């Protein structure tokens, strides 16, 4: 992969800590994620041609084991799609500051056409998404 993509307006990121239970050589890994909720969306400027992988996780309530969520994606102001994810609670990852549990990550791939493009990510306006907090991070990939 070639790099992490940051938002257009350089918003603060949430730290998520992952403890590698089965791999003692890696120890604890801290990654930075952008927050999506009912009031908060994220916009990214991406230059193509490129391939981008969008990782996502949902914040879990303590009594949940499984959760579903939807992410709505727009490319240059045009609806690209609503993506559905089903996930389970992570036993290794949590939000660093609050110690709240998050899900295992899920992902989708976007093929970015030639030129400069703007991508908006938000939670889909569905009853099932009410009250959800989702975290995303984008990685750009290039062919070798």
Predicted region positions:
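Residue-level marker for the onset of beta-strands and adjacent loop->beta junctions
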Residues: 40-42, 69, 106-108
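Extracellular Ig-like/FN3 beta-sandwich strand-entry sites
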Residues: 49, 66, 114-118
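Short coil-to-beta strand junction motifs in C2/discoidin
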Residues: 63-72
């Amino acid at each position: 992969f070639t790099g992490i993509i940051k938002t257009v307006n350089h918003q603060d990121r949430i730290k998520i800590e992952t403890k590698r239970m089965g791999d003692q050589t890696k120890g604890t890994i801290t990654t930075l994620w952008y927050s999506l909720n009912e009031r908060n969306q994220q916009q990214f400027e991406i230059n193509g041609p490129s391939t981008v992988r969008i990782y996502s996780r949902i914040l879990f309530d303590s009594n949940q084991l499984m959760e579903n969520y939807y992410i709505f994606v727009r490319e240059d102001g045009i609806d690209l799609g609503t993506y559905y994810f089903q996930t389970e609670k992570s036993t290794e990852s949590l939000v660093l500051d609050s110690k709240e549990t998050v899900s295992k990550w899920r992902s989708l791939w976007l093929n970015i056409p030639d030129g400069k493009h703007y991508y908006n990510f938000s939670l889909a306006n569905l009853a099932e998404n009410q009250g959800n907090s989702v975290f995303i991070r984008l990685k750009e990939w290039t062919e070798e």
